[in-house]
Regions:
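Short boundary motifs at domain starts and secondary-structure transition points
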Residues: 7-13
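Active-site beta->alpha loop and helix N-cap motifs at the rims of alpha/beta catalytic domains
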Residues: 2-3, 15-132, 145-147
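Catalytic alpha/beta core domains of metabolic enzymes, predominantly
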Residues: 111, 116-174
Length: 174
């Protein structure tokens, strides 16, 4: 199995890694959560930016991201989970990729979550920019209705790998 190293954390070897989310809606809630999580024994922190009430001001969110990263002494994963994949907010494809471009160019973090079924051109450009900025990509797909056949799951994981994901993730329901 291929390993992926983010700061001092190596995924794919040793013990399973623990990721703890930040899901505050306001700056104050997020700072409070980040200060607490900085003291917790976990490996990676995931900021679910789709919960953040001011996420649509992309530049300000990128600046705030720097503040959050500074509080944490752990690798930071940034995730905007779209509504169709179980997230909090609806966002057009164009705005999704614009947001990620701004965060990659202006923010401070280590990993970026990209959804497999977003438009291929935008996904490719986002992955390319992320890798230029030395960020790792977690590519994901969520099925809240069922567990697809094994062949479908393998096909999706292979597609993620072909697109350049560093880490491939599938989440399904029974």
């Amino acid at each position: 199995m291929k390993t992926v190293t983010i700061d001092t954390v190596t995924l794919g070897e040793g013990k399973p890694k623990i990721i703890v989310p930040l899901v505050g809606r306001t700056k104050e809630e997020i700072i409070q959560e980040a200060e607490f999580v900085a003291t917790v024994d976990c490996d990676i922190v995931e900021w679910r930016i789709d919960f953040y009430e001011d996420i649509f001001d992309f530049f300000a969110a990128a600046q705030f991201l720097k503040q959050v990263k500074k509080i944490l002494n752990k690798p930071l994963l940034v995730t905007f989970r779209t509504k169709q994949e179980g997230g909090e907010l609806a966002l057009s494809d164009e705005k999704y990729f614009e947001m990620y471009r701004v965060l990659l160019n202006e923010g401070s973090f280590d990993l970026l979550d990209v959804e497999l079924f977003m438009p291929a051109v935008g996904v490719g450009q986002t992955i390319e920019l992320a890798h230029e900025k030395n960020k790792k990509i977690i590519m994901c797909n969520h099925d809240f209705e069922k567990t697809p056949f094994k062949e479908v799951i393998v096909e999706r994981l292979c597609k993620m790998q072909e697109l350049g994901a560093d880490i491939c993730k599938i989440a399904v329901m029974p």
